Amino acid sequence: MANVSIHPAVDGGVVHGSTEGFAGGTLQCLCASDKVTVDVASQSAHNHACGCSKCWKPEGAKFSVVAVAPRDKVTVTAHPEKLKIVDESATIQRHACTGCGVHLYGRIENKDHAFYGLDFIHTELSQQSGWSPPGFAAFVSSIIETGTPPDQMDGVRARLTELGLTPYDCLSPALMDALSTNVARHKGLLH
């Protein structure tokens, strides 16, 4: 299965280095000069390969690799004027560099959303090591929407499993539980 390419950050194997004590780093766009930079003053969480059609992916990748960090720990530190929201109607407001197209962070503005307060980040845009490694794959079937032939999906899922990234066609069970718990709380069924 090694011939199925997922994403450059995981194709050679998921690196499970030491994350203890890691307190964050700086994300940079891919422009040659006047780079947009975003400081993330926190370890990332829920890092995963995402097959949705909205997330930024490097050239040729079937999946993005995306994690979350607390919103109050994510700060644009250089060239905010180059950022533009990709789709203002989307739940996740993805802030992309107008120069190179890279998504620097995604933010949820709906205070009632279960993930409000968490910003989505691409740790591969950081030169610092120590970020949490990817732990699962989400929205796997969605890569069909971006051009992967359906008859390749068994091979893609096998490769994800081989890499230790359990494939889901939604989010991981813990994140789906968080979404459902939020809905139940808003309905008054849980406190």
Curated annotation (Swiss-Prot):
Keyword vocabulary terms for this entry? Lyase, Metal-binding, Zinc
GO MF terms listed in the record are: S-(hydroxymethyl)glutathione synthase activity; zinc ion binding
* Binding locations of Zn(2+) 2: C50, C52, C55
Q: Which GO terms describe its biological process?
A: formaldehyde catabolic process
Q: What InterPro entries would the database entry show?
A: CENP-V/GFA, Formald_GSH, Mss4-like_sf
How many cofactors are bound and how? Binds 2 Zn(2+) ions per subunit.
| Superkingdom of this protein's organism | Bacteria
Gene3D superfamilies hit by this protein = glutathione-dependent formaldehyde- activating enzyme (gfa)
- The stretch of residues making up the signal peptide is none
Which cofactors are named for this entry?
Zn(2+)
Q: Give the metabolic or biological pathway.
A: One-carbon metabolism; formaldehyde degradation; formate from formaldehyde (glutathione route): step 1/3
In this chain the CENP-V/GFA domain maps to 22-169
**Residues the record lists as binding Zn(2+) 1:** C29, C31, C97, C100
- EC no. given is 4.4.1.22
Q: Return the Pfam families for the record.
A: GFA
**Function description:** Catalyzes the condensation of formaldehyde and glutathione to S-hydroxymethylglutathione.
Indicate the family of this protein: Belongs to the Gfa family.
NCBIfam families named in the record = formald_GSH, PRK05417.1
Q: What is this protein called?
A: Glutathione-dependent formaldehyde-activating enzyme
